């Protein structure tokens, strides 16, 4: 076939391991310095886990690459990865182990995605070539299992909640409903979607927004004339979200007991009198970390 200049098909499968946790966590350890009644002593500092092992990832890849007319190239790639026996700090009972957490092999996580790319010479002569290229990929992460039959686990330090069936990078937050125009109080949605002026941990929900961008790609073009070349390359990320901690502190008001380094929005845009329509509450309200500070971090550069 004259118009088909090249064709490649690649399929691969295999497993790999990961042991990236602190050293010696499989050992039960004791430490000194536990003095009592002027007598030197030891105390159990780590319970250990003799069954601790490597987590395992099974990866499958498929790739199809085609070339047309010696000037257009197209590729399609797909992958599926399943990680089992994940290394995770699992909550433990102090009365049983003397520790709040313990490293264990638990849980299953799956990742899958596709990538499309193409490039071609729009113009190609002896002295001049104009080439364009583009690629786009979509990646999905899902937690399949946790530990001991648990289906959800809150990571209190990151604003994330690990829930079976969801992405491990999905934010778990209260939903901000704005400011009450009558009195300047902050408002939130409860779990049922009703507006309330009470901030409750029990009203947090999975936002559907993740800090890992599912969509990403790039495009570019290049011009070559004899020995000179000019090129431009762009990359983009779509639907990625981050918590704007700077904004949280700058709009905190009296939350942290200080008014240093505050945003001028607190002065100019805050609620001042009944009837004001704004998203900045009255002075004296304690700012809560909710989804008002969850911002779209998509970019093109």
Question: Which residues make up each language-model segment?
Answer:
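Active-site-adjacent bridging/hinge elements
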Residues: 35-40, 88-91, 113, 192-200, ...
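Extracellular/periplasmic, surface-exposed regions of secreted and cell-surface proteins
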Residues: 1-163, 226, 295-301
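Extracytoplasmic gating/loop element in the C-terminal half of outer-membrane beta-barrel translocons
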Residues: 237-301
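Surface-exposed, low-complexity loop segments enriched in small/polar and acidic residues
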Residues: 93-101, 153, 158-159, 173, ...
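Conserved small-residue
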Residues: 104, 123-211, 242, 262
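Conserved C-terminal beta-signal and adjacent last beta-strands/turns
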Residues: 131, 210-238, 288-301
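Membrane-proximal, glycine/serine-rich, low-complexity loop/turn segments characteristic
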Residues: 19-33, 149-155, 163-169, 175, ...
């Amino acid at each position: 076939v004259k118009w088909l200049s090249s064709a490649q098909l690649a399929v691969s499968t295999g497993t790999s391991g990961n042991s990236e946790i602190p050293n010696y966590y499989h050992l039960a350890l004791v430490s000194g310095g536990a003095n009592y009644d002027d007598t030197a002593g030891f105390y159990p500092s780590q319970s250990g886990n003799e069954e601790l092992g490597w987590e395992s990832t099974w990866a499958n890849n498929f790739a199809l690459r085609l070339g047309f007319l010696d000037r257009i190239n197209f590729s399609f790639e797909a992958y599926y990865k399943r990680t089992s026996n994940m290394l995770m700090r699992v909550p433990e009972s102090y009365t049983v182990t003397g520790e709040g957490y313990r490293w264990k092999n638990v849980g299953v996580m799956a990742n899958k995605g596709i990538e499309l790319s193409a490039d071609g010479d729009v113009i190609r002569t002896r002295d001049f070539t104009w080439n364009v290229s583009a690629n786009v990929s979509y990646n999905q992460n899902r937690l399949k299992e946790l530990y001991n039959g648990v289906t959800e686990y809150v990571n209190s330090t990151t604003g994330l909640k690990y829930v079976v069936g969801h992405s491990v990078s999905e934010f778990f937050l209260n939903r901000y409903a704005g400011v009450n125009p009558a009195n300047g109080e902050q408002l939130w949605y409860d779990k049922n979607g009703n507006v309330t002026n009470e901030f409750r941990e029990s009203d947090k929900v999975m936002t559907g927004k993740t800090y890992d961008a599912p969509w990403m790609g790039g495009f570019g073009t290049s011009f070559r004339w004899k020995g000179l070349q000019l090129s431009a390359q762009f990359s983009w990320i779509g639907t990625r979200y981050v918590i704007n901690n700077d904004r949280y502190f700058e709009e905190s008001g009296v939350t942290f007991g200080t008014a240093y380094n505050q945003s001028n929005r607190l002065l100019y845009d805050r609620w001042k009198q009944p009837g004001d329509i704004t998203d900045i509450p009255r002075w004296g309200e304690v700012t809560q970390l909710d989804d008002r500070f969850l911002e779209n971090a998509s970019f093109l550069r």
